[in-house]
A protein has these predicted regions:
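A short acidic-Thr-Gly-centered motif at the start of a beta-strand
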Residues: 6, 35-37, 164-168
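Residue-level signal for well-ordered alpha-helical scaffold segments within enzymatic catalytic domains
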Residues: 5-8, 55, 59, 193, ...
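Short, hydrophobic alpha-helical segments
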Residues: 10, 14, 42, 198-202
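Mid-domain catalytic core of redox enzymes
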Residues: 12, 18-152
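A short helix-to-beta-strand connector/capping loop
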Residues: 8-13, 168-171
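Short beta-strand to alpha-helix junction loop
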Residues: 1-7, 15
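C-terminal catalytic lobe of FAD-dependent flavoproteins
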Residues: 136-202
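Residue-level detector of functional hotspots within protein domains
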Residues: 6, 64-67, 117, 158, ...
Length: 202
């Protein structure tokens, strides 16, 4: 996982699986309230969803409220399965991303990712991930079900995506896929930008 990869390269002391209740600024330092203890740091990077970061900050300033508060999220059920009935009938047009719309006027698109193509893996069986389509999947073909939250984008979020530099200061910096198009790569780019905007030299 990402965490395991990062942990393997860090030399400092790391705390995992720790419940953080509040983060706030105090006399030029950043205080994290964690497991009923107060820990002092020079800088805090919020590598999480925008709404989660906003909930963690005890007294967010106006810019943080307005910018982070503009990002909204939706919950989606993702199912890892092997039911090819959710893929196009013509296998020659299978793609990394596929969708089916049963009724153009009323139905939402059923999105299915072909993990074999997306991750360049060649298992014996097709590995598929479908969003919000569990009722269409053969229960016997389901391998695992998960609930994820994804950012919802509109004109307001697009405008606020250009303001990351305005809130990566005064001890706090914010990174996450919401600064881009919601992909893993966007999260990495936003982290590099957060470091640059905060003026920290890693």
């Amino acid at each position: 996982t990402y965490v395991q990869k990062i942990v393997s390269q860090l030399k400092g002391k790391i705390k995992l699986n720790s419940a953080i209740s509040n983060v706030f600024r105090n006399n030029g330092k950043c205080i994290i309230e964690m497991n009923k203890k107060k820990l002092k740091f020079d800088f805090v990077f919020f590598a999480c969803h925008a709404d989660q970061a906003l909930k963690l900050i005890k007294n967010p300033n106006l810019l943080e409220k307005n910018i982070l508060g503009s990002f909204k999220y939706s919950s989606n059920k993702a199912v890892l399965h092997q039911d090819i009935n959710l893929m196009p009938k013509n296998k020659s047009i299978w793609s990394a991303w596929n969708y089916i719309i049963k009724n153009k006027s009323t139905s939402k698109a059923s999105v299915t990712y072909n993990m074999n193509i997306l991750q360049s893996i060649t298992p014996k069986h097709d590995l598929l991930v479908s969003l919000n389509s569990d009722h269409d999947i053969n229960p016997k073909a389901i391998l695992k079900s998960m609930i994820y939250t994804h950012p919802k984008f509109n004109l307001n979020t697009y405008l606020n995506q250009k303001k990351q530099h305005l809130i990566c200061k005064n001890g706090f910096a914010f990174c996450g896929a919401y600064w881009g198009n919601g992909f893993h790569e966007d999260g990495v780019v936003s982290a590099l930008n957060a470091i640059k905007y905060s003026g920290i030299n890693p």
